[in-house]
C-alpha cells in the first residue's frame, strides 16, 4: 500500500529594519524549522508569509506597509510582526489592520510565541517523528539570516531612555537584559558553527545589566556579572581560540565605556565603537533628552584615542532637529572636524508619529533640514577620506566576504574598521602570487594601495 506523504508546510519570511529585528526573525525561523516547517525564498512558493516590520521613521512605515501589500497580493496569507505591529493609526486602532485588514494576525516586536501561535492556527505544524523527539534540533545558535561567517548577538531588548525623537520604548518596552550565561552560550555556539565576526547589538549596549542591578550569573561553572565590561571580557576570551572578531554596536558614551578600551588596545575585541551621539550642542541634546547629554564627548573621544590609538569610531547624527539654530548646527560641524569621527551617518530630521519631539517649537522647513544634512555629510566625508588615506601603505587583516574563483580574480572584504552593510569595504585586487587563494569567511592579509570613495583598495599578500 502506498503511503500518502504529508506535504511539508513552507514559510516565507521578510525581515525589515534594524539588526535587532533580524535576530527576532532568526529566532522565529529557528523555532519553526525545529517544528518541521520549511522556508521559501518566494512569496508564491510559501504557504504563509511572515513580515517582520519596522516602524521607526515614516519611510520605514511606508516600506513595511508596501511589503505587506506585496505579500498579500502574491500569497494572500500574511502574518505581521515587529515594531509597526505595535503602532496605532490616526483613529487609535491598529495601523496595519487599518491599511491591510485581510492580514491573518498582527503582533508587536519580539513576540515570538504570539507569532508561533498564529502560524500554528493558520498552518498547522507537520508531524515529524525525528524532529518531535529533538527539543533543540538546531542548537543554541539557531538559524541565521546573515552570511555564515558573521552574526548578530542581541544582548538585551528595549530601552530605558525617552529620547524625544524616538518611539522605540513605546514599541519595544523598557530595558530587559538577557541572562549573561545565555548570551555567552549563544556566542560560543556561533563561533563553533564557523562565525568569524560577532556583532554585539541592543538598544543600549552600555546599559547591559542595569535592569537586574548587574547581578551575578554563571557560565561554564564560573560567576560572571551581568555588566558590559564582564560580558565583553568573556566574549573576547571565547572568541580567541577561534581567531574571531567581536564588534560592539550601540554603545552610549557613559564613563563606564572607558573600562573596555584596554580590551581593545590589547586586541581582545575589535578597536571599533559604534556610538550614537546624535548631536554635539548641549541645548540640542537637552531638547532631544539624550542620555549622557552633559558628558564632554569631545574630551572622552580624545581620551579613547589616547588609550587605544587604533580605535575607529562610528556614529549617527540628526541635522535640522526642531529649534536647531545655525549656530548650533555650526557647533556640530566643528565637533565633526575636531572629533574626526571615522564613520558617520546623518539623517535630516523627520517627524515620527508618536514622538514628543513633534511638540517642540521651531520645526525647520524640509529644505533647510536637507541642506544641513548635505553640509554635514560633506564634512563627514572629508574627515573619512583623510582617515582612509592614512591607511595607504599599511597591511591589514581582512575578513573575506566575496571571492569568486577562490579569489584569483580578486574579491571584497572588510577590515576591523568596517562593519557589514553600514561601513565601507576593502576591494581586493587579484593576488600578486598565483598560488594565493581566498575563501569567503576566512581572513587574509592585504596591503592597502588606494582609496575609492568610502572603500579601500588592497592587494592580498
UniProtKB/Swiss-Prot annotation:
<dbReference type="GO" id="GO:0035599">
    <property type="term" value="F:aspartic acid methylthiotransferase activity"/>
</dbReference>
<keyword id="KW-0408">Iron</keyword>
<dbReference type="GO" id="GO:0046872">
    <property type="term" value="F:metal ion binding"/>
</dbReference>
<dbReference type="InterPro" id="IPR020612">
    <property type="entry name" value="Methylthiotransferase_CS"/>
</dbReference>
<feature type="domain" description="MTTase N-terminal">
    <location>
        <begin position="9"/>
        <end position="124"/>
    </location>
</feature>
<dbReference type="InterPro" id="IPR006638">
    <property type="entry name" value="Elp3/MiaA/NifB-like_rSAM"/>
</dbReference>
<keyword id="KW-0004">4Fe-4S</keyword>
<feature type="binding site">
    <location>
        <position position="166"/>
    </location>
    <ligand>
        <name>[4Fe-4S] cluster 2</name>
    </ligand>
</feature>
<dbReference type="Pfam" id="PF04055">
    <property type="entry name" value="Radical_SAM"/>
</dbReference>
<keyword id="KW-0411">Iron-sulfur</keyword>
<dbReference type="GO" id="GO:0103039">
    <property type="term" value="F:protein methylthiotransferase activity"/>
</dbReference>
<keyword id="KW-0808">Transferase</keyword>
<dbReference type="InterPro" id="IPR002792">
    <property type="entry name" value="TRAM_dom"/>
</dbReference>
<feature type="domain" description="Radical SAM core">
    <location>
        <begin position="145"/>
        <end position="387"/>
    </location>
</feature>
<feature type="binding site">
    <location>
        <position position="83"/>
    </location>
    <ligand>
        <name>[4Fe-4S] cluster 1</name>
    </ligand>
</feature>
<dbReference type="InterPro" id="IPR005839">
    <property type="entry name" value="Methylthiotransferase"/>
</dbReference>
<dbReference type="InterPro" id="IPR007197">
    <property type="entry name" value="rSAM"/>
</dbReference>
<dbReference type="Pfam" id="PF00919">
    <property type="entry name" value="UPF0004"/>
</dbReference>
<feature type="domain" description="TRAM">
    <location>
        <begin position="389"/>
        <end position="461"/>
    </location>
</feature>
<feature type="binding site">
    <location>
        <position position="54"/>
    </location>
    <ligand>
        <name>[4Fe-4S] cluster 1</name>
    </ligand>
</feature>
<comment type="function">
    <text>Catalyzes the methylthiolation of an aspartic acid residue of ribosomal protein uS12.</text>
</comment>
<dbReference type="GO" id="GO:0051539">
    <property type="term" value="F:4 iron, 4 sulfur cluster binding"/>
</dbReference>
<dbReference type="InterPro" id="IPR005840">
    <property type="entry name" value="Ribosomal_uS12_MeSTrfase_RimO"/>
</dbReference>
<dbReference type="InterPro" id="IPR023404">
    <property type="entry name" value="rSAM_horseshoe"/>
</dbReference>
<dbReference type="Pfam" id="PF18693">
    <property type="entry name" value="TRAM_2"/>
</dbReference>
<dbReference type="InterPro" id="IPR013848">
    <property type="entry name" value="Methylthiotransferase_N"/>
</dbReference>
<protein>
    <recommendedName>
        <fullName>Ribosomal protein uS12 methylthiotransferase RimO</fullName>
        <ecNumber>2.8.4.4</ecNumber>
    </recommendedName>
</protein>
<keyword id="KW-0963">Cytoplasm</keyword>
<dbReference type="GO" id="GO:0006400">
    <property type="term" value="P:tRNA modification"/>
</dbReference>
<feature type="binding site">
    <location>
        <position position="18"/>
    </location>
    <ligand>
        <name>[4Fe-4S] cluster 1</name>
    </ligand>
</feature>
<comment type="similarity">
    <text>Belongs to the methylthiotransferase family. RimO subfamily.</text>
</comment>
<dbReference type="InterPro" id="IPR012340">
    <property type="entry name" value="NA-bd_OB-fold"/>
</dbReference>
<keyword id="KW-0949">S-adenosyl-L-methionine</keyword>
<keyword id="KW-0479">Metal-binding</keyword>
<dbReference type="GO" id="GO:0005829">
    <property type="term" value="C:cytosol"/>
</dbReference>
<dbReference type="InterPro" id="IPR038135">
    <property type="entry name" value="Methylthiotransferase_N_sf"/>
</dbReference>
<feature type="binding site">
    <location>
        <position position="159"/>
    </location>
    <ligand>
        <name>[4Fe-4S] cluster 2</name>
    </ligand>
</feature>
<feature type="binding site">
    <location>
        <position position="163"/>
    </location>
    <ligand>
        <name>[4Fe-4S] cluster 2</name>
    </ligand>
</feature>
Amino acid at each position: 500500500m502506498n503511503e500518502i506523504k504529508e506535504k511539508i508546510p513552507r514559510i516565507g519570511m521578510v525581515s525589515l529594519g534594524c539588526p535587532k529585528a533580524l535576530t527576532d526573525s532568526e529566532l522565529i525561523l529557528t523555532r519553526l524549522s525545529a517544528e518541521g516547517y520549511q522556508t521559501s525564498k518566494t512569496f508564491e512558493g510559501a504557504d504563509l508569509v511572515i513580515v517582520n516590520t519596522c516602524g521607526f521613521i515614516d519611510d520605514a512605515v511606508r516600506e513595511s506597509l508596501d511589503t505587506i501589500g506585496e505579500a498579500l497580493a502574491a500569497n494572500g496569507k500574511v502574518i505581521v510582526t515587529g515594531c509597526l505591529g505595535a503602532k496605532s493609526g490616526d483613529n487609535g486602532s491598529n495601523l496595519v489592520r487599518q491599511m491591510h485588514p485581510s492580514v491573518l494576525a498582527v503582533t508587536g516586536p519580539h513576540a515570538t510565541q504570539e507569532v508561533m501561535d498564529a502560524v500554528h492556527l493558520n498552518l498547522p505544524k507537520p508531524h515529524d517523528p525525528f524532529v518531535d523527539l529533538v527539543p533543540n534540533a538546531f542548537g543554541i545558535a539557531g538559524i541565521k539570516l546573515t552570511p555564515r561567517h558573521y552574526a548578530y548577538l542581541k544582548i538585551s531588548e528595549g530601552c530605558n531612555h525617552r529620547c524625544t525623537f524616538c518611539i522605540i520604548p513605546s514599541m519595544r518596552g523598557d530595558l530587559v537584559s538577557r541572562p549573561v550565561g545565555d548570551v555567552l552560550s549563544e556566542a560560543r555556539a556561533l563561533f563553533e558553527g564557523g562565525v568569524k565576526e560577532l556583532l554585539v547589538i541592543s538598544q543600549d549596549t552600555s546599559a547591559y545589566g542595569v535592569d537586574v542591578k548587574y547581578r551575578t550569573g554563571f557560565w561554564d561553572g564560573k560567576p560572571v556579572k551581568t555588566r558590559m565590561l564582564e560580558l565583553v571580557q568573556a566574549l573576547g576570551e571565547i572568541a580567541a581560540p577561534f581567531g574571531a572578531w567581536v564588534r560592539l554596536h550601540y554603545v552610549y558614551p557613559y564613563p563606564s565605556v572607558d573600562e573596555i578600551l584596554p580590551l581593545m588596545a590589547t586586541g581582545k575585541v575589535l578597536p571599533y565603537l559604534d556610538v550614537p551621539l546624535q548631536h554635539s550642542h548641549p541645548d540640542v541634546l537637552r531638547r532631544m533628552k539624550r542620555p549622557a547629554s552633559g558628558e564632554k564627548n569631545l574630551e572622552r573621544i580624545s581620551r579613547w584615542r589616547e588609550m587605544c590609538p587604533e580605535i575607529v569610531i562610528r556614529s549617527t547624527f540628526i541635522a535640522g532637529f526642531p529649534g536647531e539654530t545655525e549656530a548650533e548646527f555650526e557647533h556640530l560641524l566643528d565637533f565633526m572636524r575636531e572629533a574626526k569621527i571615522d564613520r558617520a551617518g546623518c539623517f535630516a530630521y523627520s517627524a515620527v508619529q508618536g514622538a514628543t519631539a513633534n511638540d517642540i517649537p521651531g520645526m525647520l522647513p524640509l529644505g533647510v533640514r536637507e541642506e544641513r544634512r548635505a553640509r554635514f555629510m560633506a564634512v563627514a566625508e572629508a574627515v573619512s577620506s583623510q582617515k582612509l588615506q592614512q591607511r595607504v601603505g599599511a597591511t591589514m587583516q581582512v575578513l573575506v566576504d566575496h571571492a569568486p574563483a577562490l579569489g584569483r580574480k580578486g574579491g571584497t572584504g572588510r577590515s576591523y574598521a568596517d562593519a557589514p552593510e553600514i561601513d565601507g569595504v576593502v576591494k581586493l585586487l587579484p593576488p600578486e602570487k598565483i598560488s594565493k587563494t581566498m575563501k569567503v569567511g576566512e581572513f587574509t592579509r592585504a596591503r592597502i594601495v588606494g582609496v575609492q570613495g568610502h572603500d579601500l583598495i588592497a592587494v592580498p599578500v
